[in-house]
Swiss-Prot record:
Alphabetical list of InterPro entries matching this protein: Ribosom_uL1_bac-type, Ribosomal_uL1, Ribosomal_uL1-like, Ribosomal_uL1/biogenesis, Ribosomal_uL1_3-a/b-sand, Ribosomal_uL1_CS
Gene Ontology BP terms: regulation of translation; translation
Function as written in the Swiss-Prot or TrEMBL entry: Binds directly to 23S rRNA. The L1 stalk is quite mobile in the ribosome, and is involved in E site tRNA release. Protein L1 is also a translational repressor protein, it controls the translation of the L11 operon by binding to its mRNA.
PROSITE patterns: RIBOSOMAL_L1
Record key words, sorted: Repressor, Ribonucleoprotein, Ribosomal protein, RNA-binding, rRNA-binding, Translation regulation, tRNA-binding
Domain of life of the source: Bacteria
HAMAP family, per database record: Ribosomal_uL1_B
Oligomeric form and interacting partners: Part of the 50S ribosomal subunit.
GO molecular function, a single term: structural constituent of ribosome
The name this protein goes by in its record: Large ribosomal subunit protein uL1
Family: Belongs to the universal ribosomal protein uL1 family.
Protein encoded by which gene: rplA
Classification via Gene3D superfamilies: 3.30.190.20, 3.40.50.790
Length: 236
């Protein structure tokens, strides 16, 4: 059955040409086509030349978006002893020890990110089947397993986010809000591109970047010229 395309989407798609846009031009168009009745996010969809079924071709890391995400992140922390107070004082929204693990087992999921101290990971592993499918399982590589709770909480509150390539080698990531200026979105997108290049999996072969599209949550996909983005120097 063919999915019906709304009149609004048909009209928006007519504004997008079938070509790869210069990065800033693409983001200006993203902002222009964000016409939904709610605050839309800016999304990037990146196809990479990797096969994540092989461990040396997996990508999971974090990026610090210089202009932030535009949304409040609720952070939960699993710790014990003095680290509980440390996390609370640093601004964590939910803090607990074994009792928080039990609450998660019982269905508590009122947070966007879970940070754990290394000594609590054996307990956190008990709820791995619950956290894993939701992308919430703490990981040292993602910076969510650490004893330095104040720094981790500050960074994630300020706009650091975790992302990964899915099973088909595509990265789907929100890199701001459509209400941001195109220039601010460009700074965030450039930071994302730099991070993906710096964390290229050791087993990646051939052309690494296959395609890059951006869109507002309810907007049309806009192709971005990858070479132009990678060559861009925003420090000039």
């Amino acid at each position: 059955m063919t999915k019906k395309v709304s009149r609004r989407m048909r009209e928006l798609k007519q504004q997008v040409e079938d070509r790869a846009y210069e990065p800033l031009e693409a983001l200006e168009l993203l902002c222009k086509t964000a016409t939904a009745k709610f605050p839309e996010s800016a999304e990037a969809h990146i196809r990479l030349g990797i096969d994540p079924k092989y461990t040396d071709q997996q990508l999971r890391t974090t990026v610090a978006l210089p202009k932030g995400t535009g949304q409040e992140v609720r952070i939960a922390v699993v710790a014990r002893g003095e680290k509980v107070k440390e996390a609370t004082d640093a601004g964590a929204d939910v803090v607990g020890s074994e009792e928080l693990i039990t609450e998660i087992q019982q269905g508590r999921m009122d947070f966007d990110l879970l940070i754990a101290t290394p000594d609590m990971m054996p307990q956190v592993a008990k709820v791995g089947r619950i956290l894993g499918p939701r992308g919430l399982m703490p990981s040292p590589k993602a910076g969510t397993v650490t004893f330095d709770l104040p720094q981790a909480i500050e960074e994630f509150k300020a706009g650091k986010l975790e992302f990964r390539a899915d099973r088909t080698g595509i990265v789907h990531v929100m890199f701001g809000k459509a209400k941001f200026s195109a220039q601010d979105l460009l700074e965030n997108l450039k930071a994302l591109q730099d991070t993906i290049d710096r964390n290229r999996p050791s087993g990646a072969k051939g052309r690494y970047w296959r395609s890059l599209y951006v869109s507002a949550t309810m907007g049309p996909s806009i192709e971005v010229d990858i070479s132009s983005l990678r060559d861009l120097n925003l420090t000039d």
